[in-house]
Each structure stands twice: as structure tokens, then as C-alpha cells.
């Protein structure tokens, strides 16, 4: 076999650049929220699984939290169950909650676990109900217009927020060289199920584990300024300024708030990364430039 010197040189250069990052993150926990386009393309799905296995192989401890909104929507449509959204949250009645559990805890979770294991990992699938991994309570949503004297309380059904995370379970799995893959379903005080935003679950898991990084895969290149340029490194103070001046708005606000809360809760850095880019997770961790936006309390890159 003829050696392609240019290709070999490129591989050596990549490995050389990655080495200091590998040393820095050995033994550290990284929480990755997996969703969006990265879950829909077969090539990107395979690349994500290989990235997770490689991270574990070099001594990093990945914990995966996944979404599944499009898959839930598809099954609801086939079952002729209409979907309604309030402030970006799916109104989840009992019938919808059954579908959410079926899709997230069954189909999506097991597909991810199987893919990671096929590429040499030891993934184990969980929902927040397993060993009360994610204790939750009903999320209260209110709305007030100038004409109202008091806020209107809106019932959005079985939509929840995280109360606590069973870190003993996750630490046991990580120490046993397993890769936890978590479906964002919480359990209430009376055993009831709650549908929770996957970004929020990932953020709270990262906080509870005091993770090195929280990584949120998205369908955009990262946070952008008003000229459309990606902001590669920001402090929490700078992010708050961008929210105040309207640079960050709309659908990105909940994701950014999750990233901010994680950093303020003890996570070293949060990352908004482009899940459409092959090997996005590895590129963000192991290269100088990364492929998204890093948010930290330290001096940004």
C-alpha cells in the first residue's frame, strides 16, 4: 500500500493538536445534549457515536442527554393526536405523554445506545424514571398582558422541570466505564411522568455532576452577532449584555439561559455547537478553533 504523505501528515498534525486537550480532559465528565440534524442524518449519527466512543477510549467520561421532538411529532401525527405548543413547549396531555415515553424511552434512546455499542462503546439507556434519576415537578407557566391585573396560569399538562438528579447512579455507571444515555423524562413525587426539555435536563445533569463541559448540539453555527458572524468565545457577562441589547432573542433564549445557568452552577464551560458539522463534538473539544460558541466565566478563546 502506497503511503499518501499529505494525508498522513494531516493526520499527524491533527493528533498533535489534540494531545494537550486530551491530557487536560482525561478523567473529566462532559455532558452532551444530542438533538437536531445530528439525529436525522445517518452519516452524522454514525459520526456522533464514533466521537462518543473515542472520547471514552481516551479517558474522557461522556454523558449523553437526547431530544426527539420530530420523532414524537411524527408518531402523534400517525396516531391523529394533534400537537399544540405554548412558548415553544409541547402541551402534554396524558395521551401525548404516553407517546413521549414510548418514543424517547423506547425508540430514540435504544437507537442511540445500539449505535454507540455497535462502534465499540458500552452505552446504557436510561430515562429519568430509572432509580429516580431525574426527580421532577410540574412546570408552571404564566402569561400576562397589559390588560390583565394578574397573570394567567396556563396548564400545559405533563411538562416538568428538574428538581434533583441522582448523581450516585450516574457516577456508578461512569466509574464502571459505561456511557449513560438519558431520555429527558422526569418522575414526580407520586410516580407521575413529566416531559422535560432536553436542554434543561442536560444543563441540570451537568450542574449536578460538576461537569467540565456542557455541550448543546444545535442546527446553527453558534451564537452570532448582529452582522451574522459567529461569536466563538464569550463570558457570562458578555452573554447577558447580548441579551439586553437584543442580539440574542427569541428561540435561542431558553438554550442560552440553560448554558448560562450551567456555568453559574459550577460547570467550567458551556458550548453551543453546530451539530450539522461532521465530528462536531471532537472538533469543539480537541481543536484550537472549535466549531461553535464557548461560554465561560474565564477569559474566552
From Swiss-Prot:
Pathway assigned in UniProt: Amino-acid biosynthesis; L-arginine biosynthesis; N(2)-acetyl-L-ornithine from L-glutamate: step 2/4
Sites marked Transition state stabilizer: 33, 255
The family this protein is said to belong to: Belongs to the acetylglutamate kinase family. ArgB subfamily.
CDD domains: AAK_NAGK-C
Any GO molecular function: acetylglutamate kinase activity
Binding, substrate: 68-69, 90, 195
Main location: cytoplasm
Name of the molecule in the record: Acetylglutamate kinase
Record keywords: Amino-acid biosynthesis, Arginine biosynthesis, ATP-binding, Cytoplasm, Kinase, Nucleotide-binding, Transferase
NCBIfam families assigned to the protein according to its UniProt record, in alphabetical order: argB (TIGR00761)
Function description: Catalyzes the ATP-dependent phosphorylation of N-acetyl-L-glutamate.
Record field: catalytic activity: N-acetyl-L-glutamate + ATP = N-acetyl-L-glutamyl 5-phosphate + ADP
GO biological process: arginine biosynthetic process via ornithine; L-arginine biosynthetic process
Entry EC number(s): 2.7.2.8
